[in-house]
Amino acid sequence: MKIDITLKITPKMVKDAQGNEKKALVGHLGTHFDVMDKEFPLDYTERKAVVFDVSHVKDREIDISDIAIDQVEKEMFVAFYTGFIETVGYGTKEYFSKHPQLSNELLEELLKRNISMIGIDFTGVRRGKEHT
């Protein structure tokens, strides 16, 4: 089964991005891959997946206890829905500086389970210097 993770780009989102404090490059609004290695085989995009709705998590890191970790299997694509972009708008100061983040413990557990990809609807799995 394939899950459509398309984010509908509305005229308001485009207008907000054009007037934000930190200009976003054209074409960077929407889904993309941040690849840590130099190669990214296309078959990595065809995986079993699970999407965790963590939109209830506010003012703290997203942690292992916020998801059903037992649903995560080897080579799985694990996605997190926060709804953050709908709250603060794409490209705003808050979008870049106050976005949710995954706890180090959660990231370590996902790596231990040998997942293939992490999907998020916010700027990065960590903030600041830990952004990558």
Describe the predicted segments one by one:
Residues 1-132:
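Active-/binding-site microenvironments in catalytic and ligand-binding cores
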